[in-house]
UniProtKB/Swiss-Prot annotation:
Protein name per Swiss-Prot or TrEMBL: Protein FAM110B
The keyword Cytoplasm belongs to this UniProt entry's keyword annotation: yes
Keywords of this entry: Cytoplasm, Cytoskeleton
Biased composition (Basic and acidic residues): 192-207
Region of interest called Disordered, as start-end residue ranges on this chain: 130-247
Pfam families assigned to the protein according to its UniProt record, in alphabetical order: FAM110_C, FAM110_N
Compositional bias of kind Low complexity: 224-236
Recorded family membership: Belongs to the FAM110 family.
């Protein structure tokens, strides 16, 4: 193939040729008005809401709905705050304009803060007046925590001993480093004194439980075990030793307090729970199991006693052959009954020693006739019946 043809084919196609191939000639011949009509919106075309409004009489029966016109739902326009124009100096330049805007913003923020402070002061006045009229003069010191954000001429009114600020009632004042509030210290001291007094009163009433604190007694009264109380409170004292019989008798003679009664009842419940936990789980005795096996064997033997023979055949064969054939099964029944009685005696002895029975329960196997032995006896019995029939036939011939 010559190189000239390749060069002629590899010439790039012009832009006009590409546009002509993309757009057909019949559209290009229509002119620019055709494209302008497509871009402009069609004023004659109705929207879906307008079409429904026009056809409302077709699908609506009531005249009120037909006459009512549906207005389009418009989104709510949020009102923007008015922005005051900032006067700019001619010779000031950009820096002066920025300074003026900063000063304006500062003045706006100051005005809003003063308005908020005035509102807060009015609310606080109303609350203080209502609280003073309902509760009366209260004892306490002045709270100066929230007064720093208010005006100086109002702080003297709020620093009176009977007044209490709304913010202080909602917020807890932060404790300074190394110092605690006097009210908290007084509360802690009063709690300690109350606990010591309750311990002394309990020690005078019950000498046995004098080492317990009031918190431990409350836990015992609620029904929680002593071990849980030990783990929860690290400073709990150790449990007292078990009281002797003399001490218990002295406690019975003395008038019992309700706390002591609850303590004794919880101790009794704990002892009962431990005794219940010590008891072993109930096991089925050997006699019950052997009785079950013997009953199952008796049912099977009843079924195979006459091997499904008719009473006429039984009369012809004779009961003697069945008695002779059943001797093995009858001996087996006697043996199983004797084993049941021996198992009953063993169960009586084993009930006395529960621990020994638990140890030997895994090793013991309940007595029962094996399936192989039972099948062998039944086959032997059937074979004896067959022999009796054959002998009877021979004798008749």
């Amino acid at each position: 193939m010559p190189t000239e043809t390749l060069q002629a084919d590899s010439k790039p196609v012009g832009q006009g040729g590409a546009f002509a191939s993309a757009v057909p000639l019949r559209i290009l011949n229509k002119g620019p008005d055709y494209f302008r009509r497509q871009t402009e919106p069609n004023p004659k075309r109705l929207s879906a809401v307008e079409r429904l409004e026009a056809d409302k009489a077709k699908y609506v029966k009531s005249q009120e709905v037909i006459n009512a016109k549906q207005e389009p739902i418009k989104p709510q326009v949020l009102a923007k705050p008015p922005v005051c124009p900032v006067p700019l100096k001619r010779g000031g330049g950009v820096g002066s304009g920025l300074k003026a805007s900063n000063n304006n913003a500062k003045s706006d923020t100051c005005a809003t803060t003063t308005k908020r402070e005035n509102l807060n002061l009015e609310i606080l006045k109303n609350i203080l007046n209502s609280s003073s009229s309902s509760e009366g003069p209260a004892k306490g010191t002045s709270h100066k925590v929230g007064a720093r954000s208010w005006a100086p001429h109002r702080s003297s009114e709020l620093s009176e001993p009977g007044c209490r600020s709304f913010t202080d009632s909602l917020k807890v004042p932060p404790s300074t480093q190394g110092r605690h509030s006097p009210q908290g210290g007084n509360l802690n001291l009063s709690r300690r004194l109350l606990e010591e007094r309750s311990c002394e009163v309990d020690g005078e009433r019950s000498p046995l439980h004098a080492s317990h604190s009031s918190s431990d007694i409350r836990r015992m009264c609620n029904g929680k075990p002593l071990r849980a109380a030990r783990s929860s409170s690290s400073s709990a004292p150790p449990l007292p030793p078990k009281p002797s019989a003399k001490a218990l008798a002295a406690c019975d003679n003395a008038p019992c307090s309700p706390e002591r009664e609850t303590l004794t009842s919880t101790a009794a419940e704990l002892e009962l729970g431990s005794s219940v936990a010590r008891r072993p789980s109930l096991h089925r005795s050997k006699s019950d199991l052997s009785d079950r096996y013997a009953r199952a064997g008796a049912d099977v033997e009843r079924f195979f006693n006459y091997c499904g023979l008719d009473p006429e055949e039984l009369e012809s064969v004779g009961v003697e052959s069945f008695a002779r054939a059943n001797s093995d099964i009858v001996s087996l029944n006697f043996r199983s009954a004797s084993m049941i009685s021996s198992d009953c005696e063993q169960s009586r002895h084993s009930n006395d020693d529960l621990t020994d029975e638990e140890d030997d329960a895994g090793e013991r196997v309940p007595y029962g006739i094996s399936a192989v032995e039972r099948n062998a006896r039944i086959i032997k019995w059937l074979y004896s019946i067959k022999q009796a029939r054959e002998s009877q036939k021979v004798s008749h011939v």
